[in-house]
Amino acid sequence: MSRTVIIGSRDSQLALVQTHWVRDELQRAHPDIRFEIVEMKTQGDKILDVALAKIGDKGLFTKELESAMLEKRTDLAVHSLKDLPTALPPGLILGAITEREDPSDAVIVRRGLEAAGLADLPEGAVVGTSSLRRLAQLKHHYGERLRFQDIRGNLNTRLRKLDEGRYDAIVLAVAGMRRLGWSERISEVLSPDISLHAVGQGALGIECREADGEILDLLTVLNHPPTARRCRAERAMLRALEGGCQVPIGVYTELDDSGRLTLQGIVASLDGRNMARACRSGPGDAPEALGRAVAEDLKAAGAQAILDQIFVLVRSPGVIAPGAAPAS
């Protein structure tokens, strides 16, 4: 194929690091093709004074990138897979899922504060997070001791707010910190016992036009089958629950050497008091079926009632989450 391939990317530092990595991998595999990056801002990048859950749009960080592909201004887009809705616009497809970085959540403690992690923070310490999933699980474990506030902005902005003393700690994805070369700032990596990660967290999703066979062929070099199986199970579970990126749904997956896939899922109330849990194992070559089965188990365990209550709460004026307030 003799032409230039245009890659769409958000314009944040992390997004560009990820997109440049994808571009370089594609260039290495296809040296006869030219790959160019086009940067753009999404709605989620522009609205910084409202909690993500209050905006209530499942395509906050993807719609502009998708429009560019549908209008044939770009050929593909690079997403943090956790930001990509499970229902894609007609005509678009998830063409590749890259090898996953550590999907865990990370705690970054403010410099000068002697604490190895959340358990060591003084009573009343303020922890920043923009994720209802993290908030609900952390309130379950630390709600009696710690205070939680919303925090918005890219990773650079959040770390600056932390260092300015507006928070005592913040919770981010390990993957983002590592990709930006900031691993030394991580104070604690949260275990699945404390915080199940977001669907797709740690992996990149490469989206393209479904009918563009040439681009789909190019993307095969980026696809990592073990990661893809895990993430497709997670996304199938999320899709069956009709949840978006901004609801307290957490997952944890394992794929053993025999190809058997295990999926653990959780749906939590905003105050962390009620949790529906489910776990199943199945053949790794049927990840979507496993995801749907775990979703049904979660519904049987009370997940639907929890989600229904959350959808009412986050749409109510002035309500973000119990115990959480916008960071000033």
From Swiss-Prot:
Leading EC class: transferase
KW Disulfide bond (keyword) present: no
Gene3D superfamilies, A to Z: Periplasmic binding protein-like II, Porphobilinogen deaminase, C-terminal domain
Pathway: Porphyrin-containing compound metabolism; protoporphyrin-IX biosynthesis; coproporphyrinogen-III from 5-aminolevulinate: step 2/4; Porphyrin-containing compound metabolism; chlorophyll biosynthesis
Pfam families recorded: Porphobil_deam, Porphobil_deamC
Cofactor-binding details, from the entry: Binds 1 dipyrromethane group covalently.
Enzyme Commission identifier(s): 2.5.1.61
Cross-referenced SUPFAM superfamilies: Periplasmic binding protein-like II, Porphobilinogen deaminase (hydroxymethylbilane synthase), C-terminal domain
Assigned keywords, A-Z: Chlorophyll biosynthesis, Porphyrin biosynthesis, Transferase
InterPro entries linked to this entry: HemC, Porphobilin_deaminase_cofac_BS, Porphobilin_deaminase_N, Porphobilinogen_deaminase_C, Porphobilinogen_deaminase_C_sf
Cellular component terms per the entry's GO annotation: cytoplasm
Single GO molecular function: hydroxymethylbilane synthase activity
Assembly behavior: Monomer.
Function summary: Tetrapolymerization of the monopyrrole PBG into the hydroxymethylbilane pre-uroporphyrinogen in several discrete steps.
Additional detail: The porphobilinogen subunits are added to the dipyrromethane group.
Family to which the UniProt record says this protein belongs: Belongs to the HMBS family.
Name of this protein: Porphobilinogen deaminase
Protein species of origin: Gloeobacter violaceus (strain ATCC 29082 / PCC 7421)
